[in-house]
Amino acid sequence: MIKLGIVMDPIAHINIKKDTSFAMLLEAQRRGYELHYMEMADLYLINGEARARTRTLSVEQNYDKWYEFGSEQEIKLADLDVILMRKDPPFDTEFIYATYILERAEEEGTLIVNKPQSLRDCNEKLYTAWFADLTPETLVTRNKAQLKAFWEKHGDIIMKPLDGMGGASIFRVKEGDPNIGVIAETLTELGNRYCMAQNYLPAIKDGDKRVLVVDGEPVPYCLARIPQGGETRGNLAAGGRGEPRPLSESDWEIARRVGPTLKAKGLIFVGLDIIGDRLTEINVTSPTCVREIEAEYPISITGMLMDAIEARLAK
């Protein structure tokens, strides 16, 4: 029997209709895995050995009672076959410390999804720089004058912090906007933090597409998140409307280009953000949108994931 651990935000507070981690747990349970639940505070190191307080878990698709804890135990993380790291951002120093603990378990043979070192290496906004021919025009800087010059060149740009999620603190700055200076100062904290600027992509009106990649293989359907009511942002957390659809030709091209690199880095479950035919983000920490896609199309993305995990464990 496969022992699967999950590190996640409190399960009592999730929305099971939308929660991808919950979908993963349902599929793992369907396959007869033993489920071990952990939150960040449950992980610890003692003399270099990664350990945790875990609670065995059962889940069900029931809006009144979707989980039940069984026994509680202190275990070596190496006793688990696989651990899903599904803690949502912020990707802060605490998150990084947790990846070091998980890496100790990985060195003792536990499969970690996604690979701890790659979680640290691949910032969701910055990692697109390794595929620069696929992205919009992009500037990463702390320098207000550089941001202003980039804006003057393109006339209509998007500016965002490097550590946001769910569309937080994303600004669209159009030609002639008198606020460019204060937006640059705010995002860079007066030149003390890096931020990103990209040329505005009009294709956002047709949706910001979340394309999932499982162990290097693109999922054939994506979720287009369409901005509502004059918004620039399609993120569901910012009120965007989700519309599942098949991948376009350019979606396939991008996912097939990026996929092998993700697989080689141990990034087994990844969400690409694509606007039109441009790659804007590579989400590695806790990608979502599985439930929305699975509700519309006859596909089990969590099944693809568990197949990939089983294949890796069999090696």
Curated annotation (Swiss-Prot):
Residues bound to ATP: 151-207
Pfam families, sorted: GSH-S_ATP, GSH-S_N
Protein's recorded name: Glutathione synthetase
Family, as annotated: Belongs to the prokaryotic GSH synthase family.
Gene source species: Salmonella typhimurium (strain LT2 / SGSC1412 / ATCC 700720)
Manner of cofactor binding, per the entry note: Binds 1 Mg(2+) or Mn(2+) ion per subunit.
Associated pathway: Sulfur metabolism; glutathione biosynthesis; glutathione from L-cysteine and L-glutamate: step 2/2
ATP-grasp domain mapped to chain residues: 125-310
HAMAP family, per database record: GSH_S
Cofactor(s), by name: Mg(2+); Mn(2+)
Chain residues that bind Mg(2+): 281, 283
Catalytic activity, EC: 6.3.2.3
Reaction(s) the record says it catalyses: gamma-L-glutamyl-L-cysteine + glycine + ATP = glutathione + ADP + phosphate + H(+)
Gene that produces this protein: gshB
